[in-house]
Amino acid sequence: DPGAAIAVLKVPQGFPKAIDIEKVERLLNTPVGDGPYVLRDRAILETLYGAGLRVSELTALVVDDVDLEDSFLRVFGKGRKERVVPLGGHAKDALAAWMSGAGREVLLERRKRTDQAQRNVFLNKFGNPLSRKGTWAIVRRHGLRAGLGDDLTPHVLRHSCATHMLEAGASIRHVQELLGHSSIRSTQVYTGRREAELKAIYLEKHPRASAHLIEDTF
């Protein structure tokens, strides 16, 4: 019964979760307006997806790490390993708007007077450095607004960035460098996901997919 085989087709557990480009676009369009929180949230979402950052890397960004003129971020990953990440046009524009007088400066005026608060790129409503927990809450809130459920996380945006680049033809080495993986094995998991999805589609759609293939595990 071909229908029975189709019913059990799915990408195996353990691969990084990613969302498709249409859903990413819906998410990135949820912050509407020009208030400081809107500018901040838009910059967070665009930077997480556009640069493929870990949430800890995003919250650790300081003003000197952002080069809007040359469109680069200086990022410190695991073990304080430094890398330079390119900024796409949308992420650059969102960061520029947030770091203007209408965005970050408004929240900075509310800060408890610490040098670190003055340096951090992303701030909370009190003008203090935004925490990882706060970033997760922002991403989750906009995920709900975009109709993506309540389990959207910053890491899903990182995974989506890598997946979409590979699907567009980027080399695995370039994606490894972008994500800051010390081992290419960490990046190869994304190609495994693509292969699993291709196999699932093949088994569902190809009229000559054989019975023994349908029974195979991924």
Model-derived features: positions:
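Conserved catalytic core of the tyrosine transesterase superfamily
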Residues: D1-F218
